Structures are given as structure tokens and as C-alpha cells.
Amino acid sequence: MSAKLAYRNALKAINIAFKNDQPMLGAAKQQIRSGIMSNAQLTKPEEVAEAVKKLDEVSKFIRHNLVQGKLQEDGRYFLDFHKEIELGDNETIKNSKAEMGSLSGAKGKSIRVAKCS
């Protein structure tokens, strides 16, 4: 994959994930641009390939895992799922907490989400 294609894919992923949130959309685009500019001096093909691979992985993560939430008047969040979000299955419910680990990476802490209506 070329750097140009990886950059375009990153911009597409950001546009999908942050389509209704202009401040976050602008900040995400700026972050991608600054990442590209910081890697512009890379000359070794291995380094360039690694940077392109990393950008592609970030794009896939954003596109498939990032969901925007909007705080409602009742204090709950409305999650704006788009068609490319990976919803997964309920097989992990059968696992114990020890087998699953932690979503936040911190052992013993849990993440609570309010129900969406």
C-alpha cells in the first residue's frame, strides 16, 4: 500500500467516524496531517513501510471500532453507530471476567455505559 492511499483511507475513516462532530473532525484531520509530516523525512523503505502499515491499522481501527456518543437531556448517551462498526457477537458474555481482561487495560476496573433508548 502506498503512503498516499493510506492517507486517503485515514481521511475517509475520520470522515465516517466524526461526520457530525466538526471540532473532532478537524482535530483528527490535523493529527493525521501532523503524523504524516513527522514521517516525511523517512528514507529507508522498511521505515516507510512500517509507518504506512501503522497508519492503515489506525484507519481500520477508527473505521470499525470508534463510535460517537451524544449526551441526551436525560443524562444518557445516544451512540451513533454507522454501517462499518464491528458489533461482534455475544460469545464473550459466556467468559468469566478473569478470561476477558479489561477493556481499559487497567485490571479490576470496569466501564459502565448507560442504556440507549
From Swiss-Prot:
Matches recorded under InterPro entries: Complex1_LYR_LYRM7, MZM1/LYRM7
Localization terms from the record: Mitochondrion matrix
Tagged with keyword Transferase: no
Keywords: Chaperone, Mitochondrion, Transit peptide
GO terms of molecular function: protein folding chaperone
Similarity comment: family membership: Belongs to the complex I LYR family. MZM1 subfamily.
Role noted for this protein: Assembly factor required for Rieske Fe-S protein RIP1 incorporation into the cytochrome b-c1 (CIII) complex. Functions as a chaperone, binding to this subunit within the mitochondrial matrix and stabilizing it prior to its translocation and insertion into the late CIII dimeric intermediate within the mitochondrial inner membrane. Modulates the mitochondrial matrix zinc pool.
Entry protein name: Mitochondrial zinc maintenance protein 1, mitochondrial
The organism of origin for this protein: Lodderomyces elongisporus (strain ATCC 11503 / CBS 2605 / JCM 1781 / NBRC 1676 / NRRL YB-4239) (Yeast)
